Amino acid sequence: NKTHAYVGGGATVTANANRENVNFVDGTTTSNVNSNYKNLNDKDTKKDYVSSKSNESAQSGVLVGAKSSQKIRSWVVSGAASGAVSVVGSVNVLTFGSETKAWIGKNATVTSNHSGDILVIAVDTTSIQDVVGNVSASGAVSAGISNDTITFQKVTNAYVDEGAVLTSGRNIIIKAISDEAYVVVVVSAGAAVGATPTGAINGAVSTIVIENETTAEVKANTAATILTANGSIAIWAEDNQDLYVIAG
């Protein structure tokens, strides 16, 4: 899943900032998955020359914004019963990648006159609720296993490229925000009626691999990049994670 918003290299953008508020153009990409599945690979791509809504209070000016939001719900549950031997398993594999970038290209000139802002903002929010479980019962031997694997990669980047010249009558803000909330429950339960204490064997395994890259930057490796503002210049990156895992 890729969401890009940018001003191309060498472009010239001027906002007179004669109005009180900016009229945002929404370039939001949203992915929703609500189903039982064993494997998810999301490779959709979207590139736009757009502006996007964000949680910013701004005067009229120039906004280059990219926003991506993913809500993933997964339920994988199995069960089995037998008078003799009962074996059951649940396996879930989730692989997901998201790239959200907002930038002003090389040698671009962006001017926001009067009391206008220049905003370059990338925001990516992710919510995952994942439940994997099994229940088995038998009169002799009962065995069950639940295995859940999540691999998630995110790149959230807001930047001004080399050689660009930004002039703002108010503030210049370059901001990258990434938020993640994961709730993972992996449960395996079994019973062997009348069997020995070793007659019921159950296991639950949860593996989570998260690779996040959240950056906000002004590049100037080979050419000078000039930012001038009558107000403030802010460059920051923020990554917030809430992870709850229950396995047993």
Label every PLM stretch briefly.
Residues N1-G248:
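Low-complexity, glycine- and small/polar-enriched segments
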